Amino acid sequence: TICRPNESIISKEYLCYFMRSSAYYKRLLGSVTGTTRKRISRKNLGNVELEVPSKEIQMDVVEQLDCLVKVIESRKQELQLLDNLIKARFVEMFGDLAAPDCRWRTLHLYEACESADGIKCGPFGTQLSKDEYQSAGVAVWEIPQINNGFTSLPTHYLTNEKANQLSAYSLISGDIAMSRKGNVGKCAVFPKNFPDGIIHSDVLRIRVDHDRVLPLFMMYQLHFSRAVQYQIESVSSGAIMAGINVSKLKNIIVHVPPIQIQEQFTTFAEQIDKSKVVVQRALNEAQILFDSLMQQYFS
């Protein structure tokens, strides 16, 4: 559907931001038809109402939001450049892990873990319900925190009693937390200075044997290795939303170079990661401000 605004009343830039807002989405939901494939008629789309301020106010709103969009995109580019730097070092030190002549020892991922229970999926069903979430207590770590490298605070917590009941699903320093749904394979190492928490049902925990595999090396192998990425994509299922389970993840083949070489890479990556944390927090702040202004202007 093409939307061509009357620019004597509303600018296309202002209308575009409105159509990106949660308020617009909520208003559309009431007119959406279909279950598997949702759709909306042109008539219903045209009947969505919005408040239209003066052209001067519209211009001011667009300028503020445009500025924040530029900041957000700039921060994302910085993160990508830092990731590229780490990836270049990874390839320089370990080569192409998908190459047939790769010389490093291989193991199933479960063999690189400290125990048979090293790879764990978060609690399901009656083990943890949303009604048990608290506003403070022991953190429940979810996909959004993994996506930004644990630079944002959790949104759900548990009582100490409930967390003790779910101690088998704990997340401790050095654990690798991986998204098992949607953005499958996205992962982050749980920081040293964070209190222990519990993983959400959409999260997989990988607890490696530190005598053989360093967490940061393994995390970047999961991110950068074409061989690993291909395996994860191959075993991820779901027509609407991709997903991976524990048994499939356990049998992923990974490479295990000598620990001394892993240490050299980890030292380099840790320095770059310090810069990534600063940039990611700046990105989080800019995104929060953008979301807040969108709510303020279009709610």
Predicted regions and their residues:
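Sequence-specific dsDNA recognition surfaces
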Residues: 110-130, 144-173, 193
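A short glycine-rich beta-alpha junction/loop motif
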Residues: 1, 10-13, 33-59, 133-135, ...
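Non-catalytic DNA-recognition/assembly elements of restriction-modification systems
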Residues: 47-63, 70, 74-124, 251, ...
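A short beta-sheet element
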Residues: 1-20, 142, 163-223, 243-245
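A generic "binding-loop/recognition-motif" signal
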Residues: 24, 183, 202, 228, ...
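Feature detects amphipathic, helix-rich regulatory segments
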Residues: 2-5, 57-60, 64, 87, ...
